[in-house]
């Protein structure tokens, strides 16, 4: 049985987080992952308080297991969403796209476990000082908004820099990746891309088919000129965006291009105009499975690898 101290800290059975993917990580997927023993996460994205409250209620109708909410700090509704997670007694809050320091005192006082996603040692240290329960160290292999440091390089540096549990994210798709993360000092993993093709994931069929057909070179990162790089599957949209970026388009022009592109991919399956966020491990995702099958495969695979590695030690 694969269990780390982080499992006891959060009350979960398996050290697997499902990434809080905007327009994708809803009550359907999150409840299934939590029921499977991992930590399912609802993405609050740019939604308002009422939408999030409805999603929390829907999830609780499906499971009584621990779950989390991903709060995107750049959202215009961040303040009201930050209050909803308190009012609804959400067990875990995962934050992204910014520094959560302004909310952490209130969340901690409410008994919420706060786990920021970080892409640097500096931010990891800052949130640890402010009372974070753990951090997700997310490497540049991830889909969506990314930093510049790989998971292999980032995770051990964050582990050495803070005295709280570290969850590894980016480039993890099977038990080998989970085992590698543990060897780097992580106590858990967060994964998004493989869950895109879970049976309970409500993303568009076009999106799922693109992930299943992807290989090791199917993603590209754009938006570095804006300071907010994003990794997605190559598509007409990413080609057009990269062309505009290379031609010197302003941050405002690029922002206008990107507005609504993820929704067009996730909900409409719009190949021409959608941004299909996806990690570099998409080439390893080649079958549809239930969330439970995915979680079990990760854990069973990691156990097999970790036990086998001991045979190399004389």
How should each PLM-predicted stretch be described?
Residues 1-165:
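Active-site entrance/lid segments in N-terminal catalytic domains of soluble metabolic enzymes
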Residues 24, 172-173:
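Residue-level detector of alpha-helix initiation sites
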Residues 151-167, 173-314:
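Conserved active-site-proximal phosphate/metal-binding subdomains
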């Amino acid at each position: 049985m694969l269990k780390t101290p982080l499992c006891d800290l959060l009350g979960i059975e398996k050290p697997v987080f499902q990434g809080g993917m905007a327009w994708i990580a809803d009550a359907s997927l999150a409840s299934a992952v939590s029921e499977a023993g991992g930590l399912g996460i609802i993405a609050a994205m740019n939604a308002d308080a009422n939408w999030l409250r409805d999603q929390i209620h829907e999830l609780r109708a499906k499971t009584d297991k621990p779950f989390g909410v991903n709060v995107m700090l750049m959202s215009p509704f961040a303040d009201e969403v930050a209050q909803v997670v308190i009012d609804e007694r959400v067990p875990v809050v995962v934050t992204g796209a910014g520094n959560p320091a302004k909310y952490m005192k209130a969340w901690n006082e409410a008994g919420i476990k706060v786990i920021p996603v970080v892409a640097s040692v500096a931010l990891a240290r800052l949130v640890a000082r402010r009372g974070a329960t753990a951090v997700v160290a997310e490497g540049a292999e991830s889909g969506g908004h990314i930093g510049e440091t790989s998971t292999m390089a980032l995770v051990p540096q964050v582990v050495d820099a803070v005295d709280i549990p570290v969850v590894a994210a980016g480039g993890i798709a099977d038990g080998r990746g989970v085992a590698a993360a543990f060897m780097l000092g992580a106590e858990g993993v967060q994964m998004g891309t493989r869950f895109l093709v879970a049976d309970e994931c409500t993303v568009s069929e076009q999106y799922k088919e693109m992930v299943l057909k992807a290989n090791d070179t199917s993603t590209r990162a754009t938006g570095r000129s804006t300071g907010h790089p994003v990794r997605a599957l190559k598509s007409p949209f990413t080609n057009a965006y990269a062309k505009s970026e290379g031609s010197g388009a302003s941050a405002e022009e690029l922002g206008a291009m990107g507005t609504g592109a993820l929704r067009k991919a996730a909900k409409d399956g719009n190949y021409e105009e959608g941004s299909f966020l996806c990690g570099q491990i998409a080439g390893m995702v080649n079958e549809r499975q239930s969330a439970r099958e995915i979680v079990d495969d990760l854990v069973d695979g990691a156990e097999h690898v970790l036990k086998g590695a001991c045979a190399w030690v004389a």
